[in-house]
C-alpha cells in the first residue's frame, strides 16, 4: 500500500462505514495521463449498483473537500467480486482454506508470484500452503493478493 493509498483509506473508512458498508480496500492506479481510484466495498447482504452509487456520492463529497489527489482521476466503486482482493490480515483470516494468488514486492525463494491455500495468519504474517509446503509472507511484502474462484 502506497502512502497515498494509506492516507485515502484513513480518510474514507469512516464515511463509508457511516453509510453502512465495509471499506474492503482501495487502489490508486496511475496509467500515463489518466489515473483511477478504485474503491471496493462490501455489505453482509451483498452489493448492488445503487450501493456503489451511494458510496460514490459520499466519497466524492469527502474527496472534493479534502482534495488529497493532485492529478486528474476517475473514481470507481465496486464490490470485491469473485477474485476478491485481500488487503488486511482480517481478510486472510476470513478466507482460510481458500485458494489465493499473491504477488510480492520482494521475491521470496527467487519468486514474486505464488498460488496456494491460505493456511493461517499470525499477526502481520500470512501462511500459505504451496504445493504441499507452508510458505510465510509478511503482509508488508504483499503487493497484491486475490482469491482464486472455484468453478
Swiss-Prot record:
Species per Swiss-Prot/TrEMBL record: Vibrio parahaemolyticus serotype O3:K6 (strain RIMD 2210633)
Give the UniProt record's GO annotations in the biological process aspect: ribosomal small subunit assembly; translation
Name of the molecule in the record: Ribosome maturation factor RimP
Subcellular locations according to the entry: Cytoplasm
Instruction: Keywords in alphabetical order, please.
Output: Cytoplasm, Ribosome biogenesis
Function of the molecule: Required for maturation of 30S ribosomal subunits.
- Would you tell me the Gene Ontology cellular component terms? cytosol
Does the entry feature the keyword Phosphoprotein, yes or no? no
Its encoding gene is what? rimP
Amino acid at each position: 500500500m502506497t502512502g497515498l493509498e494509506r492516507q485515502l483509506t484513513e480518510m474514507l473508512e469512516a464515511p463509508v462505514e457511516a453509510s453502512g458498508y465495509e471499506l474492503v480496500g482501495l487502489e490508486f492506479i496511475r496509467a500515463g495521463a489518466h489515473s483511477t481510484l478504485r474503491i471496493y466495498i462490501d455489505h453482509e447482504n451483498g452489493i448492488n449498483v445503487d450501493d456503489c452509487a451511494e458510496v460514490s456520492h459520499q466519497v466524492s463529497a469527502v474527496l472534493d473537500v479534502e482534495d488529497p489527489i493532485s492529478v486528474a482521476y476517475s473514481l470507481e466503486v465496486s464490490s470485491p467480486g469473485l477474485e476478491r482482493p485481500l488487503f488486511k490480515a482480517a481478510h486472510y483470516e476470513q478466507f482460510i482454506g481458500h485458494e489465493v494468488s499473491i504477488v510480492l514486492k520482494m521475491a521470496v525463494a527467487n519468486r514474486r508470484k505464488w498460488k496456494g491455500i491460505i493456511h493461517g495468519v499470525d499477526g502481520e504474517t500470512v501462511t500459505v500452503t504451496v504445493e504441499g509446503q507452508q510458505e510465510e509472507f509478511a503482509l508488508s511484502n504483499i503487493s497484491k493478493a486475490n482469491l482464486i474462484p472455484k468453478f
